[in-house]
Amino acid sequence: MVTGPDMLWLVITSGIACFFMAFVTGANDIANTFSTSIGSKAISIKKALIVAFFFEALGASLLGGTVTDSIRSKIINFQVFYDTPEFLMLGMCCALMGATVWLAVATRAGLPVSTTHSIIGALLGFGLATGNMKSIKWEKINNIVISWLAAPILAGTCSAIAFTVLRMLILRKKNSFEIIKKMYWFLIFLITLPFSVFLIFHNPIVINTQCKMKKDGKVIVSSPCYIEDWSAAHSFYASIICILLSSLLTAIGSFVIYIIYNKRINNYNLKKKIFCEELADIEKNPQNNFCAINNSSLNSVASNETQLTQAHNNTSNGTKQNQVGNGTKSNNNNVLVLPGDKNVKSQQDDSKTNGTQKTGSVEAYHVVHIKDNGSEDKSHENMLKKNLDKVTNMNENNNNSNKNNNSNKNNNSNKNNNSNKNNNSNNGNSNEGNGKGGDPKNMENVIIENFDPQTEIVFSSLQIISAILGVVAQSANDTANAIGPFAAVFNTYNNGIRGKIKVQWYILLFGGLSMSLGLSIMGYRVIKTVGMKLIKITPARGFTIELISGLVVLFFSICGIPLSSTHCAVSSVIGLGLVEAKMNADNKRHARKSMDKDIIQVDKDKSFTLTEKIKYPFSFLNTSCVNLRLFRTVFLSWILTVVFSATVTAGIYSFAAYSPSYIMKMQTV
C-alpha cells in the first residue's frame, strides 16, 4: 500500500485528470452516438442530452468494469513496478494528461477520433518512456491492434448489408408503412437481446452473498457473489433470464414507440393538410433538401388533400374556376385553393399558355375552407403567413445563391469539363453532392433515394431505442478510457500494487456523469461532423447505423477487447453511404436542372430509376453520396491519435520522473 502525503497529490491530480479525460470523451465519443439521431432530426439535442445523462451513467456503473480492467491491467505489466509503485501511479496520471490534450484538440476541431486509441497510445508512451520494454504486454497489444482493424471493417460491412436488406424488404415496398408497423417490434428485439446477454453474462457487479460460481473452469461456492461467474455456473437459467429480460424490454419499448410514432404521424398529417407537404418539412428541415425519389410516396403524401380539392373542382363538363385575388376559388364556394395546386403539370401548361413561366420560387399549397356566407375561415391565417415568411426568406437566399452560381458558371464556361468540376468543388458548388468535391457543410443537399415519409417517421421513433443501445454500449467501452488509469492509481494508493484489482461503482458513476457533462457542453462539434457532413442521414439510415455500430461495440466489449466505438460509428456511416442507389444520366441531368429551383418537381413515374439492377453490397459502390474529402481528414486524425498521445505522455512522464529534483528526493529516501 502506497500511503502518505507524498503520494496523495498523485491521487488528487489523477482524479482531476480523470475528470477532464471523461469530459472530452463525452464530447467526442459519446457525441457519435447521437450524431445520427440528431442529424436525421429524429431527436432534439435537449432530449438527446437527457437520454445520454441517464443511460451513460447507468451503463458506466453497471457494465463499465469489464473493459476498464482490460485497459489498465492488460496493457501495462504491473510486475515491473512492484518495487516502485509510485512510478506506476505517476505514469497513469501522465497517460490521462497526454490523452486529454489530444482529445481536446480534436474535439475543438470537430474531428471524431478514438478515445480508446488515445489512452492506449498514452499508455504505450508511458511504457516506452520508462526504458523497460517489459513494462508493456506486447502480446495483448497485438489483439487490440487486430480489433482496431476488424471492428471498423465489420461495422462498415454489416451496416451496408443491413441497409441493403432493409431497403429491399421494407423501404422500397409500396406498403412499407404497413410492413414496418408489423415488424418494428422485431427490430426492437434485435436491440434488446444483445444488451440482455451482456447485462447477465458479463456484468461486473458484486453481491455480498454466498453463491455457486464458476472460476477458472471450476464450480465453487464462495462469497461475495459475482454475477458473471454465477451466470457461467448456471448457463441455462441465465439464458432463460436473458430471453425474459429481452422480451420485457421489447414489450415496454414497443408500447412506448407505438405512442411516439403515432403522435409524430398525426402531427405530420396535420401540418401536411394545413401547409402542404413542402411546408410541413420547413420547421423540421430549415435547409433545402434536394432528393431524387424512387417511388410516388412523397407525391402521395398529399393525396388526401389533392383528392379533396379535386372533389370540389370536378364537374360533369370539366373544371371551372374563378380567380379570387391571389387564390383560385372552386365553383361550390366551399374551398379556396391558394396558388400551386399539386397538379404541377397542368399549372405549368397554364403558365405557358399565358406566356409566363414561374421559376425559382416556392409556392404554398393550402386548402382554405369557406364559410356558408361566402367569407373565408381565417383560423389558420396567422400560421400560414408565418410559414410563408420562411419560404420567402428561403427564396431570397436561394435567388442570391443562384446568381452567384450562374456567374461562376459563366466564368468557367470556356474550360473543359474536368476543370469545371475542380473549380466547382473549390467553390463548393457540386450539385451532385459528390464527396470528393462537395462542400462538407452542405451534405444535406446531396441527391439520395427517399422513402415513404410515414415509414421514416416510424424509424425516427426507433432511433430513440437504438440511440439508447449506443449510449449503453459506448459507456461500457469508453468509461474504461478515463477510469482505467485513475482506478489503477486509486487502488495502488489504497490496497497496494499487489492488491486485488477492483473497480468501485462510484468511480464508474463519476466517469459516466463527467462524460454526460462533456457531451452537453462540447459535443455539438462532433455531432455536426458525423451526423451532417459525412453523408446525408435520414431516420431509416440513422437507425441502421446506430443498430450495427452498437451491436459491434457490444460484441467486442463482451469479449473484453477495447475497441474504438468512434471507428465503428464512422465506418457504419461510410459503409451505408457507399451502397446508396445510383442514378442514371437522365436523372442526374434532371436533378442538376432542378437544383436551380427551390424544390424539385418530379413526375411520379420518372422520378427515380436505377441504371441497372445492382447486386449489393459490393458489386458497385457509390461514392457520390459520401464526403470522401472529410473522411480522408478524419482517417488521418485516426493515424495521428496514437502517435500524438504517446509523444505527449512520454514527454510529460520524462519531465516528471527524470527531473533532477525528483530523482534526488527519491535517492534520499
Curated annotation (Swiss-Prot):
Cytoplasmic-facing ranges: 28-47, 108, 165-186, 261-502, 564-632
Keyword Membrane: yes
InterPro entries with a match to the protein in the record: Phos_transporter
Gene Ontology terms: biological process: phosphate ion transmembrane transport
Keywords: Cell membrane, Membrane, Phosphate transport, Symport, Transmembrane, Transmembrane helix, Transport
TM regions (residue ranges): 7-27, 48-68, 87-107, 109-129, 144-164, 187-207, 240-260, 503-523, 543-563, 633-653
GO cellular component: plasma membrane
Annotated signal sequence range: none
Region described as Disordered: spans on this chain: 311-364, 392-444
Comp. bias regions, Basic and acidic residues: 342-352
Subcellular locations according to the entry: Cell membrane
GO molecular function, one term: symporter activity
Lipid bilayer topology: Multi-pass membrane protein
Reactions performed catalytically: 2 Na(+)(out) + phosphate(out) = 2 Na(+)(in) + phosphate(in)
Topological domains, Extracellular: 1-6, 69-86, 130-143, 208-239, 524-542, 654-669
Reported function: Sodium-phosphate symporter which preferentially transports the monovalent form of phosphate with a stoichiometry of two sodium ions per phosphate ion.
Record family assignment: Belongs to the inorganic phosphate transporter (PiT) (TC 2.A.20) family.
The name this protein goes by in its record: Sodium-dependent phosphate transporter
Species: Plasmodium falciparum
Name of the gene encoding the protein in the UniProt record: PiT
